[in-house]
């Protein structure tokens, strides 16, 4: 097994990356960046091209932000399309993201991001903009993602042959936190844990969850960009590990009506300029500082406007229904898993908020940018969150302003008209991203569902 990718005391530089490849026998490296949906798109690059790209960058067709997750071209975006003839966009390699791929003989792997004008529509760059804003306000972000995902005894071919019906789960039934299940499948668990450690994506906890074949993984906390990088790497290479074992993993928000949806919760905290918690106040009943109250209040206030950046697929809205461990309104509580935001009293080192509305299928960079941007907005405007929700939020009635959009289309319209969104993320980003979500809903509307056939075919 490969040794873990070491996190150097000083950032891993372009010179370090060049030296690493020069002193190796590798003829190629692998590079990748995410599209709007959070899918890693990349290629093998020769060492000579890599050396040049480290210094000058390289070109990638800007279709990477001009198509959907099925490579269908958007027809409603201004940034790129047939009207621009899909030119190349400049890309920079990020040497500090270097990993070694253990299943490719430790091949060097680097994340990248769009640069120059293309930064305006680059998911990773949008997060970086929010982190720069936080730094300008005297804060740094610590974040940790946790994911639920279903595992199947299927292959990409078999699920298509079955038309995604009657799939065989890795394990049957409800059996959360099962020692039996993780012992029987210990080889798979250890391969996942070991691979992620080698990819500098340490898993703090891995266990079965509620549902057949469903697992939950908690990724170790890190700085903002590094946390989102790890989340992206975790999702991609979990699917790689599964398929290399003739299995499949899905991070779809809700793949079946019979089971709860899959979350991608984010734990977040801010540190001040001295590296101390900006969220903790031991004198407060909930140990919340004024900064934390304002941060949570901003998230509560803006979540309805930013939901398209949080629930990014049509399917994600099937998860946001009562009784399935997912929030249904923009609310907060202390140690309350029925609200959108869960404040966790963790003392001076781990006082934090859990952003529970996040779905597993969301782009980590976009969702973290939305969550952070909303919180910073609350701090800037000294918003107050009101009283925390106590008890079961599903059984309570809340003000209309806390209601969440019910469809992706409605969420995209809220985002387009959001002044805070345009102020935080820029007009170019809001217009481009909202258009991609409108496209996604339009594609969905072209298809007839099984529910419609069963309900209307004979009776209506």
What are these regions (language model features)?
Residues 2-460:
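Glycine-rich, acidic/polar active-site loops that bind/position phosphate-bearing ligands
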